[in-house]
Amino acid sequence: VGVVGVNGAGKTTVLNLLRGEVEPTGGRVRRGKTVKVATLSQETRELDAVAGMRVVEAVADIAQVVVAGGKEITAQQMTERMGFTRERAHTRVKEISGGERRRLQLMRLLMSQPNVLLLDEPTNDLDTDTLAAMEDLLDSFAGTLVVVSHDRYLLERVTDHQVALLGDGTLRALPGGVEQYLQMRRGAAVGSSGGAAGGAGEGAA
């Protein structure tokens, strides 16, 4: 499921509800007993605990081998799939770039084998090649994905359904995908007294 909406509409709050960090002011959230949630946040400070490890060690620290798309993937193979050369995979975490830290976050999450994966702006700080590798990995993810992103291509590639948060506490299904949401935004901009220049593309997610 892809989640879109302007900044401040409540996208991150929805993710926090799903992972149990906040409670709803009305209604309730029901979670299955077998649900295992993992979240790719926009914060990389969680990697400070493994700063002294090498990248491949930080991945293997979660699991040595996982099954993805029906195939076994080792920690070393996971780093290669996410664009780390053998040399970079043996670089200490404290020495890698911001984009590499994001990739490491995702690899550690996937090695924990969740069945629900929440992604909050997962493409931040990633180059084109890494984006392609990440999309391939997410395509093979067997569980449920909930993705908040400004990247329209990513949403259309890795999610089957999109919904819009309208900023007033309501949620609308988008059978027409992200394009339907953009049309809604354009209609709102035209209908507003100020004209809202540039509003059509603001906060695609």
Where are these regions (language model features)?
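ABC ATP-binding cassette signature C-motif
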Residues: 1-205
